[in-house]
């Protein structure tokens, strides 16, 4: 696995002004590959190691979709921990701009450790990064990843499997609910190692009467063949 400094350097090389523009315009941004093929394979390999996880969810049981996901236990794998720590500061700067635009009273700490301290004071102490796995016919219903009162406005998904090689179908879906209008959808098909950064719950949207709160949900379209793995990185912890 790479060092934390290596992951931080890769993230620092991303075009953050372009990411910020895309997040403001559409509520999401897709990056070039951040993880290598071997790193993706190593993360997929962790899925069978039950000692790495605090919880396993059969999605069909709860009518969340068809598939399975597992929440990592503490301590997180070094790559996941490094990614979570390094991605947070630039996203916190954007998140605070969003909060100001929406005229909330929320200011997110500049570091992940600061956010997690806020979470822990509110009873949210469980790590939320997770691995998700779908086989042919699997899908994920539209949802939001909320685990308590503390909600960081942005999260990311890393795509570990090779599209058109390991699986087909399985687009990443985003739907924005607009006031007094029909919902707007996006279908995104990232390659292995790429990330999608997206709104967790709300985003500021410029409307005819000023800024309004656009509600966002995300999901996964049906996998038509093969096996699809992703890494989800949520920054707030869970109750």
Regions found by a protein language model. Name each.
Residues 1-155, 160-239:
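Fe(II)/2-oxoglutarate oxygenase catalytic core
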């Amino acid at each position: 696995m790479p060092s934390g400094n290596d992951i931080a350097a890769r993230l620092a090389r991303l075009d953050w002004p372009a990411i910020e523009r895309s997040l403001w315009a559409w509520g999401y941004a897709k990056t070039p590959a951040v993880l290598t093929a071997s790193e993706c394979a190593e993360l997929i390999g962790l899925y069978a190691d039950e000692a790495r996880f605090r919880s396993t969810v059969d999605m069909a049981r709860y009518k969340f979709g068809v598939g399975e996901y597992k929440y990592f236990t503490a301590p997180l794998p070094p790559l996941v921990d490094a990614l979570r720590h390094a991605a947070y500061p630039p996203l916190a700067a954007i998140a605070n701009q969003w909060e100001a635009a929406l005229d909330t009273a929320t200011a997110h700490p500049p570091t992940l450790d600061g956010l997690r301290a806020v979470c822990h004071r509110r009873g949210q102490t469980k790590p939320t990064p997770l691995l998700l796995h779908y086989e042919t016919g699997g899908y994920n219903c539209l949802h939001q990843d909320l685990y308590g009162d503390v909600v960081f406005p942005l999260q990311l998904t890393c795509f570990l499997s090779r599209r058109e090689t390991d699986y087909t179908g399985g687009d990443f879906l985003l739907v924005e609910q607009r006031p007094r209008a029909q919902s707007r959808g996006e279908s995104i098909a990232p390659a292995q190692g790429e990330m999608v950064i997206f709104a967790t719950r709300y985003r500021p949207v410029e409307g005819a009467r000023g800024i309004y709160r656009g509600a966002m949900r995300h999901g996964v379209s049906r996998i038509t063949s093969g096996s699809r793995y992703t890494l989800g990185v949520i920054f707030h912890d869970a109750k």
